[in-house]
Design a protein with these regions (language model features):
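Chalcogenol-based redox active-site neighborhoods
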Residues: 1-189
Length: 189
């Protein structure tokens, strides 16, 4: 079994991303002091990937309202991201950074590299303002992810971070009751 990345710091990285029609440099310094999502996917110009990224683009405004920056990452180059962004109506609506990781450094740092293929698994990681990974989810290549569930998880992670001693139960939504673990609760849930 591999070691969990939960509560570990994001390792240093430098990359070039395509964002808002420009190539921009991105590093771990860009996430300091804010919440961030890293969404790894296998490749541009494929099948499940645009459905996931389009879904995430539809939720980007809500995530930004929560102070969350989004980074999609594949082992394609930033040039390939630009070409895909220019040719696909679904991908064209993306406003978040599309990181090119052709060396696989970032993909390996997050433990989602498929070495024999040079591609990333479908990995999603939520990072807190201290640079610690708080949520890690990895899917098989054939299983797409839900941005609405990711939004809910981010809201839960932020709630727990701001409410010491409280935890969010399954399917928790903002405004619903949380739990405060104690001896009194044992066996009563």
């Amino acid at each position: 079994m591999t070691q969990s990345l939960i509560n570990t710091k994001v390792l240093p990285f430098k990359a070039t991303a395509f964002k808002n029609g420009e190539f921009v440099d991105v590093s771990e310094k860009d996430i300091a002091g804010k919440w961030a999502i890293f969404m790894f996917y296998p490749a541009d110009f494929t099948f499940v990937c645009p459905t996931e990224l389009g879904d995430l683009a539809d939720h980007y405004t809500k995530l930004q309202e929560l102070g969350v920056e989004v980074y999609s990452v594949s082992t394609d180059t930033h040039f390939t991201h630009k070409a895909w962004h220019s040719s696909s109506d679904t991908i064209n609506k993306i406003e978040f950074a599309m990181i090119g990781d052709p060396t696989g450094q970032i993909t390996r740092n997050f433990g989602v590299m498929i070495e024999e293929d040079g591609l990333a698994l479908r990995g999603t990681f939520v990072v807190n303002p201290e640079g610690e990974i708080k949520i890690a989810e990895v899917h098989d290549l054939g299983i797409g992810r839900s941005a609405s569930e990711l939004l809910r998880k981010v809201q839960a992670a932020q709630y727990v971070a701001n409410h010491d001693g409280e935890v969010c139960p399954a399917a928790w939504q903002p405004g619903e009751e949380t739990l405060t673990p104690s001896l009194d609760l044992v066996g009563k849930i």
